C-alpha cells in the first residue's frame, strides 16, 4: 500500500473531521468568490467593509484584526440563511420567546423588550414634557397632543407571559394632565384603538401603527376639532405586501408573517424645504406624497411623505393651515389631513435644528398638532426644541 493510500485510509477513520474540513474549505472558497455587500436589507443595517492595515504597531494591528473579524462576520457567504437557521433552532427547538431584544408574542406579533425607562430616558422624558407644556402656554387653545400607544399597550394579552413591560398608561395620564393644565388639548386615542383591536391596527413585524390605526386616531382628532373626516370610501386604497419591519430586522424569526401597507391614491403635492435659518425655508423640491420606489426595497414604510424630512409642506384640499410636529408615526397620518386643510406643514426635529416661534409667526397656523408614539416621545433628544422660544 502506497503512502498516499495509507493517508486516505487513515482519514476515512474520521468521517466527521473530513466532512467539517470539506465544509469549511467550501465555505472559504465561496467567500472568496462572493462579492461584498454594503447593506443588508433583511437586517436593515450597514455591513462592515474590508479594513485597511494602516499602522504596523501593536495598537494598529489590534484595531485591524478587530475590524477584520467583524468584516468576516458581516460578509460570510449565506449570512441571511445562517441567521434564519439560527432563528429556527432558537424558536422551535429551544422555545425562545425573545430574540434580538424583541419579544415574540401571540398572533405572530413582535414587541420591543421595554422593561423600564433607561437612565437617558429618565432625563429626556421630563424635558420633552416640559417642552410641550411650554408650547401649549405660548399658543393657548391651539396645541393638540396625540400620543400613540405602543402595540404592547393595546395587545397586552399577546405579550409573552410574565414579561414585565413598562407601564405606559401612567405616563400617558401624566402627560395628559400636564398638557391640559398648560392650556393644550390631549387627544387620548387609547380607548378608540382598544375598541378596534380586533382589526389590523398595528404591524406584526414593525414598530409603527397601520394606516387604519392612524385613520381611527385622525377621526378622533377631527371630532375634537369639529372637522369632517377624510372619506375613505371616496378614494382608492392601494396595498403593498411583503413588508418586514424593524422588529423583524432584529428578531429574524423564521416563521414571521409579513405585513401589508395600505395607502390612498392622492394627487396632493409635497414640498420638502431646505432650511437655512429659523422659520426661513429656501428652495424646495416638490413631489407626490409617496415615494413608491421604496415599496420595492426593505424599508417600505419610508414611502410615506418620503421619510423624515426636517420641514415639508403638503398641499391640501381644505382651508386654513396646520403645523404637525412629529415622529414617523405621523407619516401615514398626515395624508388624511388633506381633506381638512389647505396647507399642512410638517416638522421633524431630527432634521430641523431650529425653534418654532418664527415659523409659527410667519405662517399663522390655525392649529398645531404634536404627534409622537410613546417610545420615541420618552427618548427623543431633539423634542426639547419645541420648548425653545424664538
Q: What do the predicted segments below correspond to?
A:
Residues 1-390:
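Extracellular glycan-modifying ectodomains
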